[in-house]
Design a protein with these regions (language model features):
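Disordered, low-complexity segments in secreted/periplasmic proteins that are enriched in proline
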Residues: 33-35, 79-118
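Divalent metal-coordination and catalytic microenvironments
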Residues: 63, 147, 237, 298, ...
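Active-site gating/metal-coordination segments in enzymes
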Residues: 164-168, 172-243, 294-297, 303-305
Length: 380
């Protein structure tokens, strides 16, 4: 991963998040009322459970990756290319580039070298605890209080690696989990019953101390196996209360269907983030509004790159329509873990977003999403 050139000092980052000295000097009421949480709610990280109030001192990134299999990018690129070809779309831009028009997902791109561009971190970092811990530790100076790792076993993520990174970096990390998408599923998914998948998800949640199911994905048309997994994730949510965030390969085709499947399985949409919707470039934000109206969250999760210019007008339209409480920000490991704060937020503020709105989106919304009242005791 490149040595990040931060566009904000720590003091500036904290102030734009609404938690610095300048923000503290504002009159009471200048920012939204503190987020409210159910009695007994916790945010589960790999090392400990936090009261949501304990993570109010900075931003939470809802979708990042700290470890992926060495062949992950190749498989991801092939799945993206197949989905785009099936929809007569041009090849996707590399991760960190402009999102595709008409709702196609972006490409993770190559890992590149350590001085490279917008791809995921290279294997020498993603498989070295000390190097990854150094990168994650840098986020503290950008005002980041917590990071969600959206990997799981079928993506090549080792939960013990994430625990060590959290311990060494001092940054609380929420572990995602589940089953990713058809090209990545273990072979047995096709023959497992929905009930068997529910049991496997609950076991994974217990053994790996998951704090969220995600990212849970589909690519083009949702396959029968993907539909089965989505239903199972919804039912596992009912048993565990863990929130859910998704991956949409072709957002314009699958976003609403993903939410439909989860809701039919018993999930309240306010426990769901539909991911990669920054890639669905639509001035009218039709799908985005529909999800917000139902109570769901919109994931703008490839921030800090050239694509910001196409995403910010959509965000501002949603903010002006009163949907700031439904937006979530992150970079999906494509642009450097701090760039959502240090590169992207100054652009959003320049477009007219207030400090109060930025605070709600980056500090309050992720805590409201991640907080849950556990139905099962923590194993580790």
């Amino acid at each position: 991963m490149p040595n990040l050139s931060q566009h904000l000092t720590r003091r500036q980052a904290l102030e734009i998040l609404g938690i610095g000295a300048a923000a503290a000097a504002l009159p009471r009421g200048a920012f939204a009322q503190d987020a409210a949480f159910p009695k007994g709610a916790i945010i589960r990280t790999v090392l400990k459970d936090y009261a949501p109030e304990e993570l109010a001192g900075g931003a939470t990134l809802f979708h990042e990756h700290m470890q992926l299999a060495t062949d992950f990018n190749a498989k991801f690129g092939a799945a993206t290319a197949a989905a785009r070809a099936a929809n007569a779309m041009p090849a996707a831009a590399a991760r960190g580039g402009a999102p595709a028009v008409a709702g196609a997902g972006g490409n993770r791109g190559g890992a590149g070298n350590r001085g490279g561009g917008g791809g995921t971190p290279p294997p020498d970092i993603m498989h070295n605890v000390d190097l990854m811990s150094e990168e994650v530790a840098k986020t503290k100076s950008a005002g980041i209080a917590c990071i969600v790792d959206g990997g799981h076993p079928d993506m090549g993520r080792d939960i013990n690696f994430i625990r060590q990174v959290s311990m060494k970096s001092g940054v609380p990390i929420v572990a995602g989990g589940g089953f990713y998408s058809q090209p990545f599923y273990p072979k047995e998914i096709s023959t497992m019953s929905e009930g068997d998948i529910v049991k496997a998800l609950i076991k994974q949640a217990d053994d790996d101390t998951l704090g969220v199911f995600g990212e849970i994905g589909s690519w083009d048309e949702i396959t029968a196996d993907e539909r089965k997994v989505f239903r199972a994730v919804g039912k596992a949510h009912v048993e565990t209360s863990l929130p859910i965030f998704t991956h949409t390969g072709i957002p314009g085709k699958s976003a609403l269907e993903q939410l439909d499947i989860l809701e039919d399985a018993g999930v309240n949409p306010n426990r769901v983030i539909i991911g990669h919707l920054g890639n669905l470039v639509d001035a009218n934000v039709y799908v985005h509004r529909a999800i917000c109206r139902r109570g769901g969250f919109i994931g703008f999760d490839r921030l800090g790159g050239n694509g910001d210019a196409q995403q910010i007008p959509m965000m501002m339209t949603l903010i002006e329509a009163g949907y700031a409480d439904h937006l979530m920000f992150s970079s999906d490991a494509s642009s450097g873990y701090s760039k959502t704060i240090t590169v992207f937020l100054p652009k959003l503020k320049a477009a007219g977003a207030t400090d109060e709105v930025i605070h709600r989106i980056t500090v309050d919304n992720p805590r409201r999403f991640l907080a849950f009242v556990p139905k099962r005791s923590r194993k580790k």
